[in-house]
């Protein structure tokens, strides 16, 4: 006979488990499904929604976390300085995200949702991209040129997001070089004032 002392201890599911499981689903190119996630965690959908919000909020949080991690990794490996290095950081971020197959597939499979999450100025992903762009500029521009106003950062981020994700959603290649050129033109015009 088995006693309770011999039974394995089962870890109770948490919000962090939900986020990890959903991220694995996303990175494997699977559709993040709330019912599948709740079932896998052994919790009800009400509990899952209380932990992570709705599906859009969950995916936005996952992509915001990925954005933050990617900018940190790129910054950790940066070797140059100045405006060229700042834009190289932005370029690497755009190239890596545009080339991330699960993200591209998501954008093409669910275009309206992807655009809300990736391009909307109010999205948590855009907040993380703005922070990453601001950090790249802060780390590479002389102190005399800082801080860069928030509206200039917003223009850089919105132009970049629009020229990156709108083409991907319709099955075209992103225009990263144009986005970088336009962004640099805006920044240099600001710095020349």
Which sequence ranges carry the predicted segments?
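Amphipathic alpha-helical segments used for helix-helix packing
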Residues: 97-120
């Amino acid at each position: 006979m088995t006693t309770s002392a011999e039974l394995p201890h089962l870890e109770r599911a948490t919000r962090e488990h939900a986020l990890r499981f959903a991220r694995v689903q996303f990175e494997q190119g699977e559709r993040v499904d709330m019912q599948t996630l709740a079932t896998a965690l052994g919790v009800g959908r009400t509990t899952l929604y209380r932990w992570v919000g709705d599906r859009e909020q969950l995916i936005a949080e996952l992509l915001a976390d990925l954005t933050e991690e990617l900018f940190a990794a790129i910054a950790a490996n940066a070797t140059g300085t100045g405006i060229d290095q700042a834009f190289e950081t932005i370029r690497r971020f755009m190239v890596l995200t545009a080339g991330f197959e699960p993200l591209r597939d998501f954008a093409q499979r669910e275009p309206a949702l992807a655009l809300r999450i990736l391009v909307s100025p109010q999205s948590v992903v855009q907040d993380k991209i703005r922070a990453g762009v601001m950090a790249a500029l802060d780390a590479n521009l002389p102190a005399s040129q800082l801080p860069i106003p928030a509206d200039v950062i917003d223009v850089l981020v919105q132009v970049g997001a629009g020229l990156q994700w709108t083409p991907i959603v319709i099955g075209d290649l992103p225009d990263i070089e144009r986005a970088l050129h336009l962004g640099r033109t805006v920044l240099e015009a600001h710095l020349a004032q």
